[in-house]
Amino acid sequence: MYYPNKKIEQEVSIPYPLYQAKKGEYFIGQTPKLIGENQNILAALVNPIDSKVDLYVNAITVTNISTLNLSAEFYLRATLNEGIVSDSVSCTNLGIIPEPIPEGEIKYLTTVTEPPQDGVNIFSRIVSSYSTLVIDGGQIIISPGQSLIVYLGGFLPLEFDNVIVAFGWWEETIYEYPCCHC
């Protein structure tokens, strides 16, 4: 049947990370090319203690630009107080001006000799030479004062030329509700 006076309603389903990108709250970034120089490397997505947001990790990549395989160990609940903050981070919605600034930071250290002493090693991977390991799914939420650390070169020889670690995440404000005494 045809109803000329009725409007057709439409519903469009989009992935939640795309929704966050549309709002200007999805960020992506990477470390520069990191060289171990007979040391191990730490790369991390860090949520500063005063951020007032949760970071929802959507993607982690480890790109091994080397002739040798590389080990990557992933830690939660570990602290990284030191490190260089990467400036290669951007909001993924290029239409928002001024560009939103993320609370989360990508940090890295190239002079470590052992894995994080605190925290939990949640999984490990081998990254083949001249390849990229991609981990996606959005199951990790980093609250203020926490981080996700990638420790490189832990259980394979410390001979790798270049590696790049990248993170994709969105940020959601933590709302504090006043206590209700009803």
Question: Which residues does each predicted region cover?
Answer:
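Beta-strand-centric surfaces of beta-sandwich/beta-rich domains
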Residues: 1-182
